């Protein structure tokens, strides 16, 4: 990540530290120009121009903040994982954004695909002025429409309650 960050000197790189991970853990991966913040992920996303995100709910949260992102997931067994993904595993995507959209909305750099060169190339596409930024914003709008308006759990609970009441009367 440090090498990739050096290619974008006009931006401040900030790491949103994960709960339960000590700050010292991150120091081996970053240099003094990169900040680490804890407990302020949403505030950070409100300010972000683009993001490198590990897979999980963070990818969906980043999309809901409409921050263009590249999903990065490294594993020491990169070649094996890449082989398994291509030939055995049935899941096309690892990020919630792509799984929900059922197509590639965000680039996933996984296992041996996560290289400094690939990070730089994909990040350049989504920073302001990048060629992929407008399309990603458009795809985020589509994703948000798929997810529906806020209050989905309340609407689901109301529908379940109504269904139970109607079945109880029958």
How should each PLM-predicted stretch be described?
Residues 1-170:
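Nucleotide-activated sugar donor-binding and catalytic core shared by glycosyltransferases
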């Amino acid at each position: 990540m440090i090498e990739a960050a050096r290619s974008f000197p006009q931006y401040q790189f900030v790491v949103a530290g994960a709960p339960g991970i000590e700050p010292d853990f991150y120091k081996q991966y970053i240099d003094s120009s990169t900040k680490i913040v804890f407990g302020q992920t949403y505030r950070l996303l409100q300010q972000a121009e683009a993001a490198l995100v590990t897979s999980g709910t963070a990818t969906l949260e980043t999309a809901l903040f409409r921050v263009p992102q590249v999903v990065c997931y490294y594993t020491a067994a990169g070649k094996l994982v890449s082989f398994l993904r291509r030939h055995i595993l049935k899941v096309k995507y690892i990020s919630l954004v792509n799984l929900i959209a059922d197509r590639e909305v965000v680039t996933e750099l996984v296992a041996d695909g996560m290289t400094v060169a690939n990070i730089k190339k994909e990040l350049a596409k989504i920073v302001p002025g990048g060629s992929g930024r407008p399309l990603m914003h458009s795809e985020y709008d589509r994703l948000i429409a798929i997810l529906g308006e806020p209050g989905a759990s309340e609407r689901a609970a109301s529908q379940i309650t109504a269904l139970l009441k109607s079945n109880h009367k029958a």
